[in-house]
């Protein structure tokens, strides 16, 4: 009888520890960036380069791949001369553990949080046909994603996904402004939103 009870207890404990990989058994959606407007540009070519991200810090999404997809879909050359360069020069995801602000919970090692500090440094440049730099700038985007240390794997992945989505929305607004207002290389009447 004791053995059966032990086996039952182990099964209950292991069942409670396992977490579904994704909410409601469904995989996280892919970040396709289809909700962001692509920009037609009055240049003949685009040059996209992405440096590997430093320290992915147990992050559910690959920042390098997402950045390459974003830039490839965002920049659409439609002109006959010149080139636009979009280079992810630096990016990182750093995990910082934060203790609980409650002294009692902190004493027992409870109530803390994991903070993912995501940083992107994107270089945008416009060159004329002669290869001269017409305009160049660097866009920095930062986001802190805070997750309770007690969150399930599914909740962590979902929160990370939402945090990156917000980071890319902020980055997209800056990229639109630079390409359309500062570089003035947009075509097709695309609006900055």
Regions found by a protein language model. Give the residues of each.
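N-terminal segment of the mature soluble domain
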Residues: 35-97
């Amino acid at each position: 009888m004791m053995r059966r009870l032990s086996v039952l207890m182990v099964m209950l404990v292991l069942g409670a520890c396992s977490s579904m990989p994704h909410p409601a058994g469904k995989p996280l959606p892919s970040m396709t960036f289809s909700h962001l407007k692509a920009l037609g540009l009055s240049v003949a070519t685009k040059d996209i380069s992405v440096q590997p991200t430093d320290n992915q810090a147990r992050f559910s999404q690959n920042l390098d791949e997402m950045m390459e997809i974003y830039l490839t879909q965002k920049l659409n050359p439609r002109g006959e001369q010149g080139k636009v360069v979009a280079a992810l020069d630096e990016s990182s995801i750093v995990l910082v553990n934060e203790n609980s602000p409650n002294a009692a919970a902190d004493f027992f090692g409870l109530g803390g949080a994991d903070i993912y500090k995501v940083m992107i440094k994107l270089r945008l440049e416009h060159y004329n046909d002669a290869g001269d730099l017409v305009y160049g700038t660097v866009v920095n985007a930062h986001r802190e994603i805070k997750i309770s240390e007690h969150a399930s794997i599914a909740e962590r992945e979902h929160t990370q996904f939402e945090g990156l989505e917000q980071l890319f929305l902020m980055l997209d607004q800056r990229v639109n402004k630079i390409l359309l207002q500062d570089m003035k290389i947009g075509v097709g009447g695309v609006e900055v939103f």
